[in-house]
């Protein structure tokens, strides 16, 4: 057994983020978000968009826009942005390569916990055919007081799934998500297989947060879980 499983408790639950982990949605989401921001009168490039907004809830994003950029999108703009995004998801959203096979082979229970609203998570899973793997084990930042990088969402998911935090493994693609998992006292595997996460700079940023490990291919995950379980 390698260092990742030599001393840790065996995993009792895997908590997947959704965007950029289960579905390759981040480039689509960023396209719509930055377009909406441009309509409001500010230009933010893609790199800055990912740095500022990746992995954060809509409530957190709108607060960042107010405090850092002086932009108040307003409810009408937010509703229009959501409509555009959902239409784009229905046309273009794809699952992360290999994720269906990975979920089918997982040796431990799992759920999804995302900064997105519940409606969006369900749409993402429906469009990509992943919904049956999760059933009702879907948790949204709208269910807790604070979104990522606060630990609330992951702790809520663990409580609902009746697993202690130190037996949870979080799969995350964003710095905010990695920070949230660590704050929840959970192990976290940083995933870099999404199309938005290919740059060395993104991987380096995740590594500075010291996740349990960084991995690129979803097909490796069931084996990592078996290794941690000692099988």
Language-model regions, residue ranges each:
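Asp-based, Mg2+/Mn2+-dependent phosphohydrolase catalytic module
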Residues: 1-12, 104, 117-231
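Active-site neighborhood of HAD-like aspartate-dependent phosphohydrolases
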Residues: 2-51, 68
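Short, acidic loop-to-helix structural element flanking the phosphoryl-transfer center
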Residues: 4, 10, 87-112, 118-122
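Short beta->alpha linker loops
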Residues: 28, 53-57, 80, 94-98, ...
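An amphipathic alpha-helix signature
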Residues: 30, 34, 58-63, 78, ...
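Helix-loop "lid/cap" segments that line or gate small-molecule binding pockets
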Residues: 36-37, 57-72, 124, 158, ...
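Short helix-capping segments at alpha-helix termini
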Residues: 39-43, 69-72, 129-133, 162-163
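Metal-dependent phosphoesterase signature
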Residues: 43, 63-101
């Amino acid at each position: 057994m390698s260092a990742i499983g030599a001393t840790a408790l065996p995993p009792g639950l895997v908590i997947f983020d959704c965007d950029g982990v289960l579905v390759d949605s981040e480039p689509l989401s960023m396209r719509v978000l930055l377009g909406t921001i441009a309509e409001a009168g500010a230009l933010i490039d893609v790199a800055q968009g990912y740095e500022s907004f990746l992995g954060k809830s809509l409530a957190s994003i709108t607060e960042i826009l107010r405090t850092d950029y002086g932009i108040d999108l307003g409810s009408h703009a937010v509703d229009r942005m959501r409509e555009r995004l959902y239409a784009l998801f229905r046309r273009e959203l794809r699952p992360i390569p290999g994720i269906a096979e990975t979920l089918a082979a997982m040796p431990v229970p799992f759920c999804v916990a995302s900064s997105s609203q519940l409606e969006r998570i369900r749409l993402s899973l429906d469009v990509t055919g992943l919904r049956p793997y999760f059933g009702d084990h879907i948790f949204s930042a709208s269910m807790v007081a604070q979104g990522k990088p606060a630990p609330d969402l992951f702790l809520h998911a663990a409580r609902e799934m009746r697993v202690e935090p130190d037996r949870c493994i979080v799969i995350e693609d964003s710095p905010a998500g990695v920070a949230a998992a660590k704050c929840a006292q959970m192990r976290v595997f940083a995933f870099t297989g999404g199309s938005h996460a290919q740059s060395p700079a993104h991987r380096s940023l995740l590594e500075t947060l010291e996740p349990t490990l960084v991995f690129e291919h979803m097909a490796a995950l069931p084996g990592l879980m078996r290794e941690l379980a000692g099988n």
